[in-house]
């Protein structure tokens, strides 16, 4: 029997706010109530428009993306990108696209805005562009290739962003603004003047009070802009950034109520004049205002999601306070910064023409409340002022102290203590001080955990410093000493211990304990620090782990070089490099398993696992395996496990490189390498990716021209796709970068931290990692390669080493005073093999 | 390999189980002892240079029900020498076998000492 179909919820628009709405829907459980379909006009999934200019300074579309197609798929949301909605048929309850009609029960407009292009004759000429989408940026980049000069029409926030982008493309850049100053919305004439000086000092020409009359052919450049006073400016490229207009045409055409100057009218619940239809973001007009910032859009998204469910969260307007860094120049604006909406407001001003700083306070007529503020040149005052404003905290007796330079009569910054519980910390995600405190009371012990739980500071990031201060303060006030010691025996992190071992050349645990251990313990170590130090020593010096000095440090698996199972027996996994094995060796595995009565199973890493080996049988089993040419597989170690491969170009019709050959070379190079955690590789011979390399710590995928390298993937409990790290590498480059990557991981990761989690916690992220590994920004590339080569050169099979040493073999006795086997190990049979009873 | 020489009486007696050379410094080995109730498996830990050099507790791990305690990592926690079970990692105090994670669980602790190079246990 079919379950009744859920009503269909359609979201038109997949920009920042449209995507945030989807997240809110998922979070609030709307996917259980509705079938959700999202339409996006652009090819790209929602991306970060706030940081769009970074597209020219190295970030690509992927790194700007706010989500992944997987996220949508996992939550059962159909995402239809590159499919523009052309009409809304309210009578039929359907939307129309070039591909068909789709019925809706509820509809949300998140169509955003478009850049306003002033109606200037000539504005349609080639090389006259706008700055809004990734495609716009691609067009600007292409046009800039044949240009030497560029002009931005519009000196507001987005205009200056665009000017910075043109500058980044090495164009001689000018900004033309119709108003008498730059950023007329945010700053007054004094602030505007200072801003002009600072921006001109960067080599950008600033023309204010200019209205462009027409654009015609230039004499020296492609275009000539003619201004109202007949002055002219020649340029090869023009970018219009003169404000935004709501994308309300769909709503207009279907008869929804539209504001006088555009925008779909919504109420506090984000409902339009048709209660089946909602609108959020820059297309929505609330209380006669369009909100052109991301934070209010996110708040609308939250309210809209709530309206679609039980209701309860309304949109109550939003604060338009903002701080930005434009071309390296700080600009901040809080509340009624001009003081023209507050009767009787009084102003305080501070201007330092040498340091080029300007600050203004707008104070209520009784002098008690801050109603607005303006900053140019130094935003360090912003956080404190915003808290005074947003939380209506009573001003100090002399408010001017709040904008005086630090060190003078300045008032101390408002500490986290002074903030009321309702103080808004992150306006993008609507997180208050009380929310942060609740998370900490609920067990969050560091900044990362608070960010993870509340999402604070993951929107525009403007509150990062404030959030950190608050979290540190709250942790301290709860007596949490943020202690990163590995355990009670060493007051160091794993990374610090690694550096000590490396720098001082310490080769044993006892020497490390003697020199750096906590004297207030028995100096025996514990099951945390001993295996961690054993791993560090092995990564640095690669002495056999069964040497007398190292044996007490090892986990039981490393001690006996096999994997302990729940009944105290062990499993044995010989190395089968790349998953390639000869029939002869395959026969030997079967014979050994028969002889020692072992359960056999093929592993996920293309090897064969022999289970149920008794401790005292391990040396004999290995004697036979080594005799047949096997070596240890390190399945028991925090070390390289396997390099999984597909069959590649030698057999496969589609393969473009010899993936098996490469997998074997990789496995033989890195086998025995001990690391903070286990490491898995995969090598695929073509983009069909049959080896699933993108779920591995190191993934290698063949291309026509060489190899693409992926890093930090993971399967397991929290799967993570590996990230593309470098493309079309030669064999030599591939080995070099993997050498560096793994050694850098070994040097800096925490104990038991896989490469995926390490990478996620790495400050600076993938870009930083690329700089270190590919561009050698720290100058340690050769050192890392040398350290890896030392490990490779000192490899010996641990089992070969152990069985040739009678002293080491003594360790494999089940009982030191009797050869009797452990009578408590009892088996039964299942599907023709034995298993623990 | 020496066999356990047990005095078959109903009272506890000291018996020799192995020699110093059979022990692994800062780690454990397992041995059989004969008790009035029958044979038992004991884990013997050797901490050369420490105030008490020898400890012996049950080899049987009550959490996993496997005989593996001698194969755990030896260490000290909050001032007390302990061994961590190699299977589910609970800590047992070497002194008296008390489990630090679960008050209700305690392994038997056996009296153990060197007589010359021989290791003797009272069982």
List each language-model region with its residue ranges:
Chain B
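N-terminal pre-ligand scaffold of iron-sulfur
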Residues: 1-79, 93-94, 106-123
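Short cysteine clusters
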Residues: 61, 85-88
């Amino acid at each position: 029997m079919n379950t009744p179909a859920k009503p269909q919820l359609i979201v038109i628009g997949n920009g920042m706010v449209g995507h945030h709405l989807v997240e809110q829907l998922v979070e609030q459980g709307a996917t259980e109530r509705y079938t959700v379909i999202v339409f996006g006009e652009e090819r790209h999934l929602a991306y970060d428009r706030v940081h769009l200019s970074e597209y020219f300074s190295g970030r690509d579309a992927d790194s700007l993306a706010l989500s992944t197609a997987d996220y949508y798929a996992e939550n059962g949301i159909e995402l239809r990108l590159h499919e523009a909605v052309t009409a809304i048929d309210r009578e039929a309850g359907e939307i129309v696209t070039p591909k068909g009609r789709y019925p809706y029960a509820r509809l949300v407009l998140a169509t955003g805005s478009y850049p306003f292009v002033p109606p200037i004759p000539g504005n349609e000429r080639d090389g006259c562009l706008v700055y809004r989408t990734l495609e716009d940026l691609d067009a600007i980049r292409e046009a800039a290739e044949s240009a030497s000069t560029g002009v931005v029409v519009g000196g507001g926030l987005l205009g200056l962003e665009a000017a910075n982008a043109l500058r980044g493309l090495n164009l001689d850049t000018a900004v033309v603004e119709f108003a008498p100053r730059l950023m007329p919305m945010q700053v007054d004439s004094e602030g505007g003047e200072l801003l002009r000086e600072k921006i001109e000092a960067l080599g950008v020409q600033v023309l204010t009070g200019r209205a462009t009359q027409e654009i015609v052919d230039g004499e020296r450049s492609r275009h000539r802009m003619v201004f109202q006073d007949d002055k002219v400016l020649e340029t090869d490229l023009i970018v219009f950034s003169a404000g935004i207009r709501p994308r309300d045409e769909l709503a207009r055409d279907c008869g929804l109520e539209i504001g006088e100057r555009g925008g779909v009218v919504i109420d506090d619940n984000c409902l339009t004049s048709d209660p089946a239809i909602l609108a959020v973001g820059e297309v929505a007009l609330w209380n006669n205002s369009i909100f052109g910032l991301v934070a209010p859009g996110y708040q609308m998204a939250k309210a809209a999601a709530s309206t679609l469910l039980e209701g309860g969260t309304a949109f109550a307007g939003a604060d338009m306070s903002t701080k930005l860094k434009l071309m390296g120049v700080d600009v901040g604006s809080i509340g009624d910064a001009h003081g023209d909406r507050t009767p009787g407001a009084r102003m305080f001003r501070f201007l330092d023409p040498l340091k080029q700083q300007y600050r203004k306070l707008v104070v209520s007529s009784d002098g008690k409340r801050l109603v607005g503020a303006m900053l140019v040149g130094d935003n360090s005052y912003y956080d404190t002022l915003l808290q005074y404003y947003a939380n209506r905290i009573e001003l100090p007796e002399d408010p001017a102290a709040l904008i005086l330079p630090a060190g003078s009569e300045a008032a101390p910054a408002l500490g986290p203590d002074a903030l009321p519980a309702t103080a808004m910390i992150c306006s993008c995600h609507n997180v208050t001080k009380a929310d942060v405190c609740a998370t900490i009371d609920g067990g969050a012990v560091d900044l990362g955990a608070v960010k993870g739980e509340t999402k604070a500071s993951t929107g525009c990031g403007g509150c990062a410093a404030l959030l950190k201060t608050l979290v540190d303060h709250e942790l301290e006030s709860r007596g949490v000493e943020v202690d990163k010691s590995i355990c009670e025996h060493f007051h160091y992190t794993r990374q610090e211990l690694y550096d000590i071992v490396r720098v001082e050349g310490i080769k044993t645990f006892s020497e490390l304990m003697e020199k750096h251990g906590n004297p207030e313990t028995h100096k025996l170590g514990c099951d945390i620090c001993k295996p961690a130090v054993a791993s560090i020593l092995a990564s640095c010096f690669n002495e056999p782990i069964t040497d007398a000095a190292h044996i007490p440090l090892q986990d039981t698996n490393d001690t006996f070089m096999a994997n302990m199972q729940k009944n105290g027996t062990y499993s044995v996994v010989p190395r089968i490099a790349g998953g390639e094995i000869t029939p002869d060796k395959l026969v030997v595995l079967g014979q050994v398993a028969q002889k020692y009565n072992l359960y056999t199973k093929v592993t996920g890493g293309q090897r064969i696992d022999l289970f149920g080996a008794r401790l005292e049988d391990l040396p004999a089993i290995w004697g036979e395996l080594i005799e047949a040419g096997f070596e240890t597989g390190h399945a028991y170690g925090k070390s390289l496990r396997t390099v999984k491969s597909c069959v590649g170009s030698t057999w496969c019709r589609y393969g473009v490189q010899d993936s098996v050959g490469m997998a074997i070379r990789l496995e033989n190079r890195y086998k025995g390498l001990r690391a903070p955690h286990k490491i898995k590789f995969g090598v695929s011979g073509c983009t069909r990716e049959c080896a699933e390399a993108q779920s591995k710590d190191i993934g290698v995928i063949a291309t026509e021209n060489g190899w693409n390298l992926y890093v930090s993937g993971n399967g397991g409990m929290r799967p993570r796709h590996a990230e593309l790290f470098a493309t079309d590498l030669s064999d030599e480059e591939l080995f070099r970068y993997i050498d560096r990557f793994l050694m850098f991981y070994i040097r800096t990761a925490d104990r038991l931290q896989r490469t995926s989690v390490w990478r996620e916690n790495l400050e600076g992220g993938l870009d930083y990692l690329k700089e270190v590994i590919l561009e050698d920004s720290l100058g340690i590339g050769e050192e890392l390669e040398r350290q890896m080569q030392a490990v490779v050169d000192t490899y010996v099979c641990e089992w070969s080493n152990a069985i040739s040493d009678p002293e080491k073999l003594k360790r494999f006795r089940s009982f030191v005073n009797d050869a009797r086997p452990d009578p408590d190990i009892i088996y039964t049979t299942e599907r023709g093999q034995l298993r623990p009873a | 390999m020496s066999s356990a020489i047990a005095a078959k009486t109903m009272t506890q007696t000291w018996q020799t189980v192995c020699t110093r050379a059979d022990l692994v410094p800062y780690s454990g080995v397992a041995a059989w002892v004969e008790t009035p109730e029958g044979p038992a498996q004991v884990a013997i830990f050797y901490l050369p240079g420490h105030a008490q050099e020898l400890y012996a507790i049950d080899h049987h791990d009550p959490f996993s029900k496997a005989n593996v305690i001698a194969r755990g990592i030896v260490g000290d926690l909050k001032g007390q020498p302990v061994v961590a079970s190699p299977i589910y990692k609970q800590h047992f105090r070497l002194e008296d076998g008390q489990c630090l994670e679960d008050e209700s669980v305690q392994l038997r602790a056996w009296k153990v000492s060197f007589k010359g190079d021989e290791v003797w246990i009272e069982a």
